[in-house]
């Protein structure tokens, strides 16, 4: 169908005006909401298109960083601009068609915690529209006190399936009824108890959650304890200190993919986090995809590593790279590995390698070769063999042939 072209008052060809209102509203929906609203000043017709967009559109993205005049000149102008933004959000939500809005995203900055009640009002209006996907990012750069709690309606809403909470938002103590996806980014966790105590920590039960993301960028001045019971979790993305994650009831039996970016407090500042780490790793034994990263483990001197899967040994290389003071490495489970290339970037200071339950198979020898050629500071290699090994002298000669030139004086003990 050929589009009719209209000459504008300036003489140029206008291909927009002939389009139907519904199509123009759809085009507006691709603009940031505030920009779309600014088209209302173009003409009398355009004044009706933005409300129509809200009536038809299934998603709203409201961000005060997209204000038409974002420069903060004076304190008075700052409050005028942000009050205007809140009024704009309120009117925009009021113009939405009931049950048509599926996603609501709100991002803004405020220095007054007392106005949190206005924020909860915005959330309530969005939830009244039947929103299933709610995103909230509130920034309070000048506030030094905990923000107010989110309303219980956020957690017990019947339509909400996906919830994203970011910065300066405070979780209450309400359960999540129907959530399937939860994303937590640098939120404040309510804990009225002055003493750091796992038994009095906020406890959340979320039977339906399939995806959980917790991200704090390891930015914390005091310990946080968050206990979330998620028995049906299939995806976990966690980046923080370990005080926030582990619940003894969580075994993650259905977990298929996990991304762990773990941080450890200095000198056990908040308890034995390494024990917690071990519990977590033992609880994700059924995981199929594992992404593991952490900061440098500055003082780790001895590492005992056991694994019978190729992916585990690739993980070991990462552990060695992040342990600059590692001197003793104990390996077990080499018999389950074949064709696993080992590469350790940045060098290492490993002086002692101990291999347990060595069975003398070809794949084991190849795997030992991969590791030993990366150890240029080796002083001693201990091999604890199984009863299947008869010719220990030949084994010793084989291992000597694998050593890099810089470790040619290394002592080898076959036990």
From Swiss-Prot:
Transmembrane segments: none annotated. Gene3D superfamilies: 1.20.1280.50. It holds the Pfam family F-box. It comes from the Eukaryota. InterPro entries: F-box-like_dom_sf, F-box_AtFBL13-like, F-box_dom, FBD, FBL60-like. Residues 13-59 form the F-box domain. This is Putative F-box protein At5g40050. It comes from Arabidopsis thaliana (Mouse-ear cress).
């Amino acid at each position: 169908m050929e589009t009719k072209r209209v000459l504008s008052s300036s003489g140029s060809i206008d291909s927009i005006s002939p389009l139907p209102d519904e199509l123009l509203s759809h085009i507006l929906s691709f603009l940031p909401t505030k920009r779309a609203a600014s088209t209302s000043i173009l003409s009398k017709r355009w004044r009706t298109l933005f409300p129509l967009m809200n009536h038809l559109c299934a998603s709203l993205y409201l961000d005060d960083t997209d204000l038409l005049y974002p420069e903060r000149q004076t304190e008075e102008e700052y409050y005028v601009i942000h009050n205007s933004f809140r009024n704009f959000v309120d009117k925009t939500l009021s113009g939405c068609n009931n049950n048509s809005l599926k996603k609501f995203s709100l991002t803004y900055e405020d220095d007054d915690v007392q106005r949190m009640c206005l924020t909860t009002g915005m959330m309530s209006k969005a939830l009244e529209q039947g929103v299933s996907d709610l995103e909230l990012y509130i920034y309070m750069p000048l506030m030094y006190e905990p923000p107010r709690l989110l309303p219980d309606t956020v957690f017990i809403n019947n339509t909400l399936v996906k919830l994203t909470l970011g910065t300066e938002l405070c979780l209450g103590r309400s359960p999540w009824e129907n959530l399937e996806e939860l994303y937590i980014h640098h939120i404040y966790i309510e804990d009225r108890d002055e003493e750091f105590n796992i038994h009095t920590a906020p406890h959340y039960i979320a039977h339906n959650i399939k995806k959980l993301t917790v991200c704090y960028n390891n930015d914390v001045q005091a310990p946080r304890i968050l206990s979330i019971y998620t028995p049906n979790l299939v995806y976990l993305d966690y980046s923080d200190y370990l005080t926030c994650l582990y619940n003894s009831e969580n075994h993650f039996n259905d977990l298929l993919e996990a991304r762990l970016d773990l941080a450890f407090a200095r000198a056990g500042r908040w308890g034995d986090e390494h024990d917690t780490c071990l519990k977590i790793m033992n609880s994700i034994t059924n995981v199929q995809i594992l992404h593991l990263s952490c900061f440098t483990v500055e003082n780790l001197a001895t590492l005992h590593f056991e694994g019978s899967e190729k992916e585990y040994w690739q993980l070991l290389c990462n552990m060695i790279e992040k342990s600059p003071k590692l001197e003793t490495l104990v390996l077990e489970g080499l018999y389950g590995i074949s064709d696993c290339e080992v590469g350790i970037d940045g060098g290492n200071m490993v002086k002692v390698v101990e291999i347990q339950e060595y069975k003398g198979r070809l794949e084991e020898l190849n795997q030992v070769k991969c590791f030993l050629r990366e150890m240029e500071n080796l002083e001693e290699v201990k091999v604890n063999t199984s009863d299947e090994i008869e010719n220990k002298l030949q084994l010793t000669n084989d291992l000597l042939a694998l050593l890099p030139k810089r470790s040619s004086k290394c002592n080898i003990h076959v036990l």
